[in-house]
Regions:
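Class I S-adenosyl-L-methionine
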Residues: 1-103, 107-108, 126-132
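A contiguous loop/helix-start segment that scaffolds small-molecule binding in enzyme catalytic cores
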Residues: 2-6, 19-22, 69-71, 139-172
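Short, contiguous strand/loop micro-motifs
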Residues: 8-9, 119-121, 143-144
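Residues that form generic nucleotide/phosphate-binding pockets
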Residues: 61, 136, 159
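Short, well-ordered alpha-helices that flank and scaffold nucleotide-derived cofactor binding pockets
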Residues: 86, 90, 111, 158, ...
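A short alpha->loop->secondary-structure connector
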Residues: 90-96, 115-119, 162-168
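Short, glycine-/small-residue-rich phosphate/pyrophosphate-handling segment
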Residues: 110-139, 148
Length: 172
């Protein structure tokens, strides 16, 4: 049985896709992931397994597909940074996974800003309650929040301002 390739595909277009990720995708018989990650491979002739419905059902199907061919699960950014990898670890042993890191959105952000990220607190508000933002804020360092369509920059800013946090510079 082949290991499940967990492939970080970067923050967006293929120009951030690392060579090791390209190799894993090319060598896979089955590509799994969110619809936007699978879209570029629609005409590839590979079997596509979209993440639809419940996550547990998807992971069950992913486990079954591993017995029928080489599977690559495509995840945004770096799978080692706020991703599905944690949940996969509850289903598969580490030796059953081949994790291929990717470029994360925060790396691209800091590169574009031309600054280092050492010392920056990081937290995800993706699919999480806004109250989680309060756990990560510190006076002595910056905080980077990963956001989603519900917890947008303006929503988070208003939430923090309503709780008495002073105005701060924000990069969105």
């Amino acid at each position: 049985m082949d290991r499940l390739a967990v492939v970080g595909v970067g923050p967006g277009p293929g120009n951030y896709l690392l060579p090791a990720a390209r190799e894993a995708i090319a060598g896979a018989d089955i590509l799994a992931g969110g619809p936007r990650h699978l879209e570029p491979y629609r005409e590839s002739g590979k079997e596509l397994l979209p993440l639809e419905g419940s996550l547990d059902t998807f992971l069950d199907r992913l486990g079954e597909k591993r017995h029928t061919g080489r599977v690559a699960l495509l995840l945004s950014g770096d799978p080692c940074f706020f991703s599905l990898l944690g949940k996969l670890g509850t289903r598969f042993a580490p030796e059953e996974l081949e994790v291929i890191p990717g470029v994360s959105s925060f790396q691209v952000l800091f590169a574009r800003l031309g600054i280092q990220w050492n010392g920056t607190e990081t937290a995800s508000l993706h699919g999480r309650p806004l109250e989680d933002a309060l756990k990560s804020l510190r006076e002595d360092r910056g905080t980077l929040f990963l956001l989603d369509r519900k917890n947008t920059g303006p929503v988070v800013a208003a939430f923090l301002k309503d709780r008495g946090f002073p105005d701060r510079v924000a990069v969105l």
